[in-house]
């Protein structure tokens, strides 16, 4: 029987106590610099609407429903209801902001529709329809290209850049089409036009299009870098819209395929992605994970990258307190800033709530024929090699055979093992088997129908292990 994930109590309590605040700083004080944000309120509703019908929270339905109402009502206070403004139907990003971002509409529409499904309050439905059919249409029509203008102020000043992250708006437009059949054609045409323009920039790993120079751009001094969360949100939006398309496969594969460089040997994209990614030089461009990625990508990974899904859950489960913070470092998951982030906790709560142990032909073979090894992920190399704390992993182990090995001086065939694992091992990680330590030398993934099923790794005994 499949083992279901359970949301940590601290995550649930954090959302119930602090949403819609964006950040909470020690000792549990909402950060006044950022205050409340519609992003945090929307993502909290996304989680709570799922928790409302989950067995784990069967006795909490009343308080969850009340919190959903509180958050949805607050989001409505941030919506522009003046039909004479270009921001009409949009949502202020924060309490003190004057900017109404397209992507915030994309975040709020699904949340308001979730709240409508739980409560039956048609005010939430009407607000979502206004955001999709009026505001996003306005943001699309303001420029001639087909995406969505980034933002407009309450004074009708425009930010006309077209962000690929706005592909996330496809989720809300699709949900609107399902519940508002009368206007389904409108929502579909908005979505189709957005995809028609943004797809090429997304496929080529650009962050935004600048109408002023008619060029695509990234960030960084050489414009080589992208934000991981922007691409995660865009991936989820396009995946929801068109499934596991060639575009989704290519973008996910490209970002997931960026491995640990010599400067950051602890980096592991199977856990989550780097906050900044140099997509030209194929390099994590900062020292920390943007852990929200693990939550945003859970649906995609559950369908098409089960090894990464399982490994990310194993790590986040073990270090669940650290992953509530924004920006855990690659080495020990300590935060670069001691602030807990509502968006991160809400998305990781969805991961916990929906997690099911992957069941594949290989995992079933492992269950009967595998043995437990201890994995020590590589953290650093220097005067001495440093590894992380051990993790129990299951694998099938065979002794190396001379025909498939390249021997190094001082080693014999008895010093090598071949490991077949569901866990995505990395070169130079350490494995302990029956008290003997081995270093991973090579890793070869094996796929079925394009999705990785397992890994074959050749490991060499550590003579000083």
Features from the language model and the residues they span:
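Glycan-recognition and catalytic cores of secretory/periplasmic carbohydrate-active enzymes
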Residues: 1-357
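Exposed, low-complexity/repetitive linear segments and helix-based recognition motifs
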Residues: 25, 101, 287, 329, ...
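Solvent-exposed, flexible loop/coil residues
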Residues: 95, 152, 372, 379, ...
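Beta-strand-connecting loop/turn residues
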Residues: 146, 371, 435-436
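Short, surface-exposed loop and linker segments with low hydrophobicity and enrichment for Pro/Ser/Thr
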Residues: 338-342, 363-369, 408-414, 449-452
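Active-site-proximal polar cores
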Residues: 358-386
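Short, conserved turn/kink motifs that form compact alpha/beta structural patches or helix kinks used as
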Residues: 380-465
């Amino acid at each position: 029987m499949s083992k279901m994930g359970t949301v940590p109590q601290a995550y649930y309590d954090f959302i119930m106590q602090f949403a819609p605040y964006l950040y909470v700083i020690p000792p549990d004080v909402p950060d006044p610099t950022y205050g409340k944000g519609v992003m945090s309120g929307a993502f909290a509703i996304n989680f709570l609407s799922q928790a409302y019908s989950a067995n784990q929270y069967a006795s909490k339905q009343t308080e969850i429903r009340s919190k959903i109402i509180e958050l949805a009502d607050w989001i409505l206070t941030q919506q522009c209801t003046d039909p004479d403004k270009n921001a009409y139907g949009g949502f202020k990003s924060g309490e003190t902001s004057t900017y109404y971002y397209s992507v915030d509409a994309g975040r709020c529409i699904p949340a308001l529709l979730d709240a409508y499904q739980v409560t039956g309050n048609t005010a939430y439905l009407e607000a979502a329809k206004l955001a999709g059919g009026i505001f996003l249409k306005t943001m699309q029509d303001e420029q001639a290209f087909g995406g969505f203008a980034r933002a407009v102020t309450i004074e009708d000043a425009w930010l006309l850049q077209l962000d690929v992250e706005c592909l996330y708006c496809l989720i809300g437009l699709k949900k609107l089409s399902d519940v508002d059949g009368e206007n389904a054609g409108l929502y579909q045409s908005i979505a189709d036009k957005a995809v028609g323009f943004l797809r090429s920039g997304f496929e080529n790993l650009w962050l935004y299009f600048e109408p002023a120079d008619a060029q695509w751009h990234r960030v960084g001094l050489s414009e080589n870098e992208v934000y991981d969360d922007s691409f995660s949100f865009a991936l989820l939006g396009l995946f929801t819209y068109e499934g596991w398309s060639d575009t989704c496969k290519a973008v996910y594969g490209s970002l997931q395929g960026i491995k640990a460089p010599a400067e950051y040997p602890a980096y592991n994209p199977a856990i989550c992605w780097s906050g900044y990614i140099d997509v030209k030089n194929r390099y994590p461009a900062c020292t920390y994970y943007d852990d929200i990625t693990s939550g945003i990508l859970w649906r995609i990974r559950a369908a098409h990258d089960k090894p990464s899904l399982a490994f990310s859950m194993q790590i986040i489960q073990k270090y669940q307190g650290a992953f509530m913070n924004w920006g855990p470092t690659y080495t020990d998951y300590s935060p670069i800033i001691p602030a807990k982030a509502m968006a991160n906790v809400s998305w990781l709560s969805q991961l916990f709530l929906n997690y099911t142990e992957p069941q594949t032909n290989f995992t079933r073979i492992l269950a009967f024929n595998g043995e437990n090894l201890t994995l020590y992920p590589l953290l650093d190399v220097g005067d001495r090699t440093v590894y992380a704390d051990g993790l129990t992993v299951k694998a099938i182990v065979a002794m190396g055979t001379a025909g498939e090995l390249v021997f190094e001086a001082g080693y014999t065939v008895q010093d090598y093992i071949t490991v077949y694992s569901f866990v995505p091992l990395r070169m130079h990680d350490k494995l302990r088997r029956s008290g003997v330590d081995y270093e991973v030398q090579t890793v070869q993934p094996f796929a079925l129908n394009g999705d990785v099923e397992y890994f074959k790794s050749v490991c060499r005994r550590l003579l000083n292990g």
